[in-house]
Amino acid sequence: MPPRTRQGLAILATALALGLVADLLAHQVPARLDVALGLGALVLALVALVQGGHVVLPAALAPLGAPLALLAAALIWRDSPTLFALNLLGVGSVAALASPRVRAAGPRRAGLGDYAVGAAELAWASAGGAAALVLADIDWAALPVEGRLRHARGTVVGLAAAVPVAAVFGGLLMQADPVFDRLVGRTLQIDLAPLASHAGLVLLWGWLAAGVVRVLCRPEAGVARPRSGGTLGLGEVGTVLAVVDLLFLAFVVVQFRYLFGGADLVRGLTGVSYAEYARRGFFELVTVAALSLPMLLLADWSLDQRDPLRARRFRRLALLMLLLLDVMLASALFRMRLYTESYGLTELRFYTTAFMGWLVLVLGWFGATVLRGRRERFGTGALLAGWLVLAALNLANPDAVIAGVNLDRAAAGRPLDADYAAELSADALPAFRRGLPRLGTVEACAAATRLERRWGDERAGKARWTIALARAPRGPIDCGAGRSG
């Protein structure tokens, strides 16, 4: 049997086993835990293939085990659905590192294009890799026809031929005798809906697993394309940057004059409160910073930098934009602080602030790499910055932070949104149990009632399992005052 066929059969059998495991996890294991265990099953399947001598995994995959294990643990650590989605995104970034395209370029030199192609490569492998495995990798004509395999093939062919024959004769005999008809009907009374559900899940996850395992085990990796030089001159690229720099500079001057100038100055000019003034700009400023980064990357890529003088002028314009963006992000952070003091903290505000922190890191890394002629190092650094922010989010426990900030505001006499408090995940429950008793207000008791009702129902359903949900204290929540109704 050719080695490629032997490897293909091993991958196919492993994929079917993973499909069975996925079906079992989907039906028997609570949500969140099933995803973490599924990742573990995939890793164990790869190890089993290597230990059995069926495949040889690229050496570049070994260092990815540690971040994948940490992310799998993070999936079941916190209860926040938003953080769960971000952790899944982190798993996807590890998968992109494992793609043949990124492996070929090397993690230290893989650019953003390599990561994009690698992600597309994995997506395509998941969708169509199983078909290539069955139709191209496995030479079915080369399979041995003697011994057990021959007998097994004969049995399968015989069963396939016997089914329609038995169906025809059985139908005639059932019509001939009503007693026989009833006995056969009772014996073959099968509910096909659950069987179809199980079979569909096994085939779906087996199909996806076959494509993923195949591309991870593929020894040949695509050749990374060298970066092509830009063709545009400084007149085209520099004009765009200069105009944007002037616009940013004008905005920054306004920030120093009014936002950082105090509430009286703002109220006298606009007629609105300081908090209302700050409320309008946070998300817009973060969007401006997020759009500026790809614009700078595109400008660097499109500029013909063979002339050193032209390259230096471009870098000065880009560096000025980075400095102005830092001031604008500081303005956004200042606005968020005022906004939170007046209106409280929500998930959207918290995670947008975290995204802003990632932007600060990436903009600094852009200046340290791209503006110094080391563009190929930017992609991996941006990815590592994302991992750093993700780790900080998992350690910080966002929902607990949100609950703590809003409880502190309530203790200072500000209103507490009981409905929003009940929408937070189980990560916030310990903070509410500590903070609500010291309030002793009607709003606190309303929040306690909503929290008890929600988490009593969710725990009874056992729809998901996380460490935070399992460890959250049970029982009534004290609100520091007697409840009515």
For each feature predicted by the language model, list its residue ranges.
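Hydrophobic alpha-helical transmembrane segments in integral membrane proteins
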Residues: 374-379, 390-416
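Alpha-helical transmembrane segments of multi-pass integral membrane proteins
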Residues: 120-133, 153-175, 201-207, 236-259, ...
